[in-house]
């Protein structure tokens, strides 16, 4: 699963996801893409599950680009532990995804295969997404 090799600080504030994506909203690498429609935190497990679903359906033909990286540590306290006594330990890593963010891109396959592969990948993610395609000029 994806996670940073090293970070400046172990824990982070929760924060809020406001506004729309300022960058990373266009197709940069592939012919087809999966674009987020709503703000949410997507964890590393979801990203990995989506990647596996996409590559499995494509039967390893073509190429997949993951355009999001889980760089936010999410902490949790153990169950049945009283409040206080400091912040919990890091449970998993997540990525704050804004609306309009390109999450996955694929190339080297037909539109039908790309559409179905990204539909299967989207089912693993906790955000609403849509299929996008490069416009031929």
From Swiss-Prot:
Q: Which domain of life is it from?
A: Bacteria
Q: What CDD domains does its record include?
A: Ribosomal_L16_L10e
Asked whether the UniProt record includes RNA-binding among its keywords, one would answer yes
Q: Which UniProt keywords apply?
A: Ribonucleoprotein, Ribosomal protein, RNA-binding, rRNA-binding, tRNA-binding
One annotated Gene Ontology cellular component of this protein: cytosolic large ribosomal subunit
Keyword field contains Ribonucleoprotein: yes
GO molecular function terms listed in the Swiss-Prot or TrEMBL record: rRNA binding; structural constituent of ribosome; tRNA binding
Q: Which InterPro entries would you find in this protein's record?
A: Ribosomal_uL16, Ribosomal_uL16_bact-type, Ribosomal_uL16_CS, Ribosomal_uL16_dom, Ribosomal_uL16_sf
GO biological processes: translation
Q: Which Pfam families match?
A: Ribosomal_L16
> Which PANTHER family does the annotation name?
50S/60S RIBOSOMAL PROTEIN L16, LARGE RIBOSOMAL SUBUNIT PROTEIN UL16M
Q: What does this protein do?
A: Binds 23S rRNA and is also seen to make contacts with the A and possibly P site tRNAs.
Note the subunit structure. Answer: Part of the 50S ribosomal subunit.
Question: What family name appears in the similarity comment?
Answer: Belongs to the universal ribosomal protein uL16 family.
Name of the protein in question: Large ribosomal subunit protein uL16
Q: In which organism is this protein found? A: Agrobacterium fabrum (strain C58 / ATCC 33970)
Name of the gene: rplP
């Amino acid at each position: 699963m994806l996670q940073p090799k090293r970070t400046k600080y172990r824990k982070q504030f929760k924060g809020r996801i406001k506004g729309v994506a300022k960058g990373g909203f266009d197709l940069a690498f592939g012919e087809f893409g999966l674009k987020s429609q709503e703000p949410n935190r997507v964890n590393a497990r979801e990203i990995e599950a989506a990647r596996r679903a996409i590559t499995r359906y494509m039967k390893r033909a073509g190429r997949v680009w993951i355009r999001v990286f889980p760089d936010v540590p999410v902490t949790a306290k153990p169950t049945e532990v009283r409040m206080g006594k400091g912040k919990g330990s890091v449970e998993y890593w997540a990525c704050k995804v804004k609306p309009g963010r390109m999450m996955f891109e694929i190339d080297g396959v037909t539109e039908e295969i790309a559409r179905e592969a990204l539909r299967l990948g989207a089912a693993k993610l906790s955000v609403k997404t849509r299929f996008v395609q490069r416009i031929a000029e």
